[in-house]
Swiss-Prot record:
Location, primary (coarse class): Golgi
Protein name, UniProt field: Zinc finger protein-like 1
Keyword Transport listed: yes
Family of this protein: Belongs to the ZFPL1 family.
Record's keyword annotation contains Membrane: yes
Zinc finger (B box-type): 1-43
Organism: Homo sapiens
Bilayer-crossing regions: 267-287
Keyword annotations of the record: ER-Golgi transport, Golgi apparatus, Membrane, Metal-binding, Phosphoprotein, Transmembrane, Transmembrane helix, Transport, Zinc, Zinc-finger
Subcellular location per the Swiss-Prot or TrEMBL entry: Golgi apparatus, cis-Golgi network membrane
Amino acid sequence: MGLCKCPKRKVTNLFCFEHRVNVCEHCLVANHAKCIVQSYLQWLQDSDYNPNCRLCNIPLASRETTRLVCYDLFHWACLNERAAQLPRNTAPAGYQCPSCNGPIFPPTNLAGPVASALREKLATVNWARAGLGLPLIDEVVSPEPEPLNTSDFSDWSSFNASSTPGPEEVDSASAAPAFYSQAPRPPASPGRPEQHTVIHMGNPEPLTHAPRKVYDTRDDDRTPGLHGDCDDDKYRRRPALGWLARLLRSRAGSRKRPLTLLQRAGLLLLLGLLGFLALLALMSRLGRAAADSDPNLDPLMNPHIRVGPS
């Protein structure tokens, strides 16, 4: 169990494997829609995760995704295509998760952001509307654009290298008028920003994606005495009396309420009783010490007392 860092501050057992933070279902739908999220216990057992879709083996961040109630994440197009291949008379229990064989349709008594988002997504296709008990609709098939592949641009470098202009072409190009060196550009409309597209045709490199920023809704203006919840500080050994220091710090920082008249009288009575007992103990110790050193109380010093054989 952990505490989510969002303003709701809800206790949750869900853990984002990519950002390594506890997340509630509200943050899961709003800010971690394409992250691998499972229970915190599973992350403790094995923190490795696969960022690709298990149906097409393509990164999840490249396409639209949907999350089932078991928190497994798939591309919506892949899940829709797989479910559409089943017969039309398939029972709702026959639509199962490809990963854990759990139900795709959320239970009717299950409420939450994940279940609500899944119901809204399933309501857009007929095979799911039949399982949800909704009337069928006319589906509009909109082809999803395929992601660009770097192999499409692999032959452009050879084209760029083979099309090097000769000296005669350079001379003829320099002799042309100056206004032919630049293509005329249409005037940009004031209410619409101008868009530019740059294509690098030489030295193709594999596409890489930068890691996404860790989602953290905590305010930047933290209290100077509080420290961030980082991984290095989370698992380090705590001192034995750390709880006592935190308790004293919390009591010293809190505002004390003024004592009532009855509380003041009880406090004075307690202090007076403690002082009287301390005075009795001190006088008893001093009196016993004086009696031990008094020669009049020593029987050997008394002439009227004889010790030994008569």
